[in-house]
């Protein structure tokens, strides 16, 4: 399901979904290597914009926008988890290296799935209930401190 991380080769095209402060710090380090860095972000004045080799203004949660941006990259990564996972899955199936893997992003984006993953893999986490209905709230209300 999840591939091992492969090296990013010199001359590669690296795309980043999200152009905030973390992306800016990433670019400031990555710029020392022979990679072409592109950023997709909805804000024209995103912190990454002045540092990237190319900047595309657009929505990173829109399938068509992410797909069009990603098909020109060798490697895609994220700066924010609120991205279109379906587009990343398609790009991965077409040979684009996507990190983190879209399957991992699905878990990270859904905090309920994330908590279930922790529990299934014995990763310490705070106690939790998955609440899907009013009845669930009524059933678990006595277990909450307030």
Name each model-derived stretch:
Residues 107-146:
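Active-site nucleotide/adenylate-binding loops and adjacent lid/helix of ATP-dependent enzymes
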Residues 1-104, 108-109, 113, 135:
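ATP-binding N-terminal substructure of ATP-dependent carboxylate-amine bond-forming enzymes
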């Amino acid at each position: 399901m999840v591939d091992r991380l492969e090296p990013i080769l010199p001359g590669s095209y690296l795309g980043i979904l999200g152009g905030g402060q973390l992306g800016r710090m990433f670019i400031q380090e990555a710029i020392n290597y022979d990679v072409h860095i592109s950023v997709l972000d909805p804000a024209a004045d995103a912190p990454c914009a002045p540092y990237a080799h190319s900047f595309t203004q657009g929505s990173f949660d829109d399938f068509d926008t992410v797909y069009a941006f990603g098909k020109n990259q060798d490697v895609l990564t994220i700066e924010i988890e609120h991205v279109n996972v379906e587009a990343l899955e398609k790009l991965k199936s077409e040979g684009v290296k996507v990190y983190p893997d879209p399957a991992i992003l699905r878990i990270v984006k859904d905090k309920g799935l994330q908590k279930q993953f922790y529990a299934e893999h014995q990763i310490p986490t705070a106690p939790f209930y998955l609440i899907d209905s009013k009845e669930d709230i009524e059933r678990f209300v006595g277990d909450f401190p307030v």
